[in-house]
Amino acid sequence: MTDSPSKRLFILDGMALAYRAHFAFFSNPIRNSKGVNTSAVYGFANTLLGILEHERPTHIAACFDTSAPTARHKLYPAYKANRESMPEELSDQMPLIFRLLEAMNIPILRYEGYEADDTIGTLARIADGTEGFQTYMVSQDKDLGQLISSTCFLWKPGKRGNDHEVIDLAKLKEQWGIERADQVVDILALMGDSSDNIPGLPGVGEKTAKLLIGEFGSVENLLSNTDKLKGKRKQIVEENGDMAT
C-alpha cells in the first residue's frame, strides 16, 4: 500500500452489501422487539461504521441497482434471468438502509437503466483521473477487477469473521495471471459467470480461459486467430465464439 493520499474515496456496492448482511444471519436472523427482521440493516451498518472508523474516507457514496432494465438486458434477455426475486424480509429493510445513509449524509446513487456497477465504474474512473485520490470499491464483485489501477482498489468485505481484503493491481495480476486489469472481463467472457447467467464457452473453465487470454491477450484477438488453435479447443472456440462477445 502507498502512503495515505489526501483524498480517500470509498464507493459502496450497496445492494450487494445488503444481500450479504441479510444472508449472513439467515439461519439466525436479528429481529427487533416487534419480531421484524433487521439483519440486513444491522450488518450493513456494521460494515459501514467499520469503514468510517478504520479507513477514514474523505469521500463516500453508496450505489444501488434499480428495477428498470438495462442495456445489458436488452442486448441479452437472459442476463441475470436465473436470479430469484429479492426476499421479502430484505425488501422490507431497504427503506431503513436508505434512511440510515440519508441520516449519515452519505449520497445514494441509483439511476434507471444503469446497474450499481456502472455507477461505481463511472465514479472510479473519474477519481482515477483526478490528482490526489485513492479509490476503494467496496464489493465482492469480481467484474469490478477490470477497474483496478495504481490508485483504485477492490475492498472485499471479510467472510465469517475474517478481516477484509484489499486487491491491488499486483495482486489482481497474480490471481488472474494477466498483464492488464481489463483482461478480467475477457477471462469471465470465456469461462462464463453463473451469477450473471453468462454461459461462456462450453467446456472452458477458469484454467483454460486464463491460458487462452494469456496467449492471445483478448477475446477479440483470440477469435481472429483461431487458426493457431488445435483439436477440440479450436472447434469449441470457432463454433461458440459468439457466446463470448
Where are these regions (language model features)?
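Non-catalytic nucleic-acid-binding/docking modules located in mid-to-C-terminal regions
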Residues: 3-6, 56-61, 129, 149-153, ...
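Noncatalytic, basic helical substrate-engagement surface that gates or grips nucleic-acid strands
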Residues: 2-138, 142-170, 243-245
